[in-house]
């Protein structure tokens, strides 16, 4: 396993990034392997944090999924297909925050797997300004809750749960707050992408 992780970090192609991301998001559930996992995680975090190329590739990957923001305070909805006029709350809402938190955890060698915990730890380490960390956590919570509520509505109506929401199904109040949450995510993507997500 150590050799696999070393190879993934040394050659950060898309498949290696995906496999490394799985590793960084793992958490032990107990048993005799917990100590081995901790040692392996510490080593891979050290190696990853010391590899600017690997971090750059992970950051680039984290910025691929952008919030669905359109012009004039609207949403950029899916234009065709089964989910036309919907937004993807997972890939364009929850995933961008998870990816940003993972990158910060790698940069700071933060051995945490939970997104909220990673963001709080990054704030405590001075990697994200306190106000920005709080805003991003609140945005993440709102997007995640909106996703769960939408899935519950789908199930209640006899349909299969998915990650797609039609903004037209929301109230003006709900749309405004969801859009504000997406703006927070986009702003943080820009800040971290340009190395500005630190106090100062």
Question: What does each of the following model-derived ranges do?
Answer:
Residues 1-200:
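A nucleotide- and high-energy phosphate-metabolite-utilizing enzyme signature
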């Amino acid at each position: 396993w150590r050799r696999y992780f070393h190879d993934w970090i040394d050659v950060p192609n898309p498949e290696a990034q995906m496999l490394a991301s799985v590793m960084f998001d793992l958490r032990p559930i107990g048993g005799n392997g917990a100590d081995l996992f901790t040692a392996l995680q510490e080593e891979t975090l050290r190696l990853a944090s010391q590899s600017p190329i690997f971090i750059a590739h992970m950051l680039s990957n984290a910025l691929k999924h952008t919030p669905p923001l359109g012009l004039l305070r609207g949403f950029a909805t899916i234009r065709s297909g089964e989910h036309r006029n919907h937004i993807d709350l997972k890939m364009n809402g929850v995933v961008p925050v998870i990816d940003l938190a993972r990158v910060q955890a790698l940069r700071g060698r933060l051995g945490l797997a939970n997104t909220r915990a990673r963001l709080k730890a990054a704030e405590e380490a001075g990697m994200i300004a306190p106000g920005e960390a709080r805003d991003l956590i609140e945005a993440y919570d709102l997007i995640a809750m909106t996703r769960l509520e939408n899935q519950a509505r789908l199930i209640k109506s006899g349909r299969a749960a998915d990650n797609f929401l039609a903004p037209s199904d929301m109230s003006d109040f709900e749309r405004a707050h969801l859009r504000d949450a997406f703006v927070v995510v986009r702003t943080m993507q820009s800040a971290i992408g340009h190395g500005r997500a630190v106090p100062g």
